[in-house]
């Protein structure tokens, strides 16, 4: 009986550790996706989006690159 309880406790610890590492990996992936603000090529206008640090807005009215002030 003690062996079964020890095995069950060990299984809970292993599953919890795997779950925590997977959750951390997904959080880091989400942060990387949210942090990626690289402008993509404009579809409507056919030119590249402006750099937000230099030009402010990217490409207002295009299908891909729209900054917050353009929405």
Curated annotation (Swiss-Prot):
The UniProt record's further free-text remark is:
Negative results: does not show activity on 45 human receptors from 9 families (5-hydroxytryptamine, adrenergic, dopamine, muscarinic, histamine, neurotransmitter, opioid, sigma, and gaba(A) receptors).
Taxonomic classification, please? Eukaryota, Metazoa, Ecdysozoa, Arthropoda, Chelicerata
Keywords (A to Z) from UniProt: Disulfide bond, Ion channel impairing toxin, Knottin, Neurotoxin, Secreted, Signal, Toxin
- Entry text on domains: The presence of a 'disulfide through disulfide knot' structurally defines this protein as a knottin.
Propeptide per record: which residue ranges? 21-35
List, alphabetically, the GO terms of the cellular component aspect: extracellular region
- Write down what this protein is called: U5-scytotoxin-Sth1a
Per UniProt, subcellular location reads as:
Secreted
**Which cystines does this chain contain?**
42-60, 49-65, 59-70
Q: Where is the signal peptide?
A: 1-20
This entry's Gene Ontology molecular function terms read: ion channel regulator activity; toxin activity
């Amino acid at each position: 009986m003690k062996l079964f309880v020890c095995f069950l406790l060990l299984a809970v610890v292993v599953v919890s550790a795997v779950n925590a590492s997977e959750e951390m990996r997904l959080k880091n992936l989400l942060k990387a996706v949210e942090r990626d603000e690289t402008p993509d090529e404009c579809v409507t206008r056919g030119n590249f989006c402006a750099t937000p640090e230099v030009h402010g807005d990217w490409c207002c009215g295009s299908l891909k690159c729209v900054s917050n002030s353009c929405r």
